[in-house]
């Protein structure tokens, strides 16, 4: 092989290797910043079509309804823990260390974004509450499908009295 061909071959191999390295780093960065949406049932039982469950340490978004009576606040800090459930019976505990949105209430729909812990709790970095009684985030509405039922607070209050 003459020196000119050898130089071209070395340059081509280096160029292909560089492009492959850049592509793999780009895919790794995109994958680590990807936030997948799950319902509480999908976290507990896995996705319905694939059976895939999120791994501990994975960054995810969870949408569902805040379970009535599940909210526990720490009186000395902003730490709050509550459960989120869906119509299929799945439930996950969420911890949050910041101010909750003004519209956050038990029995309301929310979307929480954070990291799934080894213990199955979601350490939320962001909690979004729905706007009014008719609004539901698109991901939550799609995931809950036709099984979502609006809570009737008047019946709950009369039963409690």
From Swiss-Prot:
- Keyword Transmembrane helix among UniProt keywords: yes
Using the UniProt annotation, give all residue ranges assigned to the region (Disordered). Answer: 138-161
Q: Which Pfam families would you find in this protein's record?
A: CcmE (PF03100)
Keywords for this protein: Cell inner membrane, Cell membrane, Cytochrome c-type biogenesis, Heme, Iron, Membrane, Metal-binding, Signal-anchor, Transmembrane, Transmembrane helix
Amino-acid positions noted as binding heme in the UniProt annotation, renumbered to this chain: 131, 135
- A GO cellular component annotation in the UniProt record: plasma membrane
Classify the protein's membrane topology as the record does: Single-pass type II membrane protein
Q: Where are the transmembrane segments?
A: 9-29
Q: Where in the cell is it found?
A: Cell inner membrane
Q: Which residues lie on this side of the membrane: Periplasmic?
A: 30-161
Q: Which residues lie on this side of the membrane: Cytoplasmic?
A: 1-8
What GO terms are given for molecular function? Answer: heme binding; metal ion binding
Question: Would the keyword Transmembrane helix be found if you checked this record's keyword annotation?
Answer: yes
Please list the coiled coil stretches.
Answer: none
What name goes with this protein? Cytochrome c-type biogenesis protein CcmE
Organism name: Shewanella sp. (strain ANA-3)
């Amino acid at each position: 092989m003459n020196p000119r061909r050898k130089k071209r071959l070395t340059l081509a191999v280096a160029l292909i290797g560089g492009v492959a390295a850049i592509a793999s780093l780009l895919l790794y960065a995109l994958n680590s910043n990807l936030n997948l949406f799950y319902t509480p049932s999908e976290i507990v039982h896995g996705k319905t079509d694939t059976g895939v469950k999120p791994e501990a340490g994975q960054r995810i978004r969870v949408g569902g309804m805040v379970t009535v009576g599940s909210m526990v606040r720490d009186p000395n800090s902003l730490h709050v823990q509550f459960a989120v459930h869906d119509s299929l019976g799945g439930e996950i505990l969420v911890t949050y260390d910041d101010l909750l949105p003004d519209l956050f209430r038990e029995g309301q729909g929310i979307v929480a974004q954070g990291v799934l812990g080894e213990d199955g709790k979601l350490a939320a970095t962001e909690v979004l509450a729905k706007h009014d009684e008719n609004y539901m985030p698109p991901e939550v509405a799609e995931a809950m499908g036709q099984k979502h039922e609006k809570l009737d607070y008047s019946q709950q209050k009369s039963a409690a009295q």
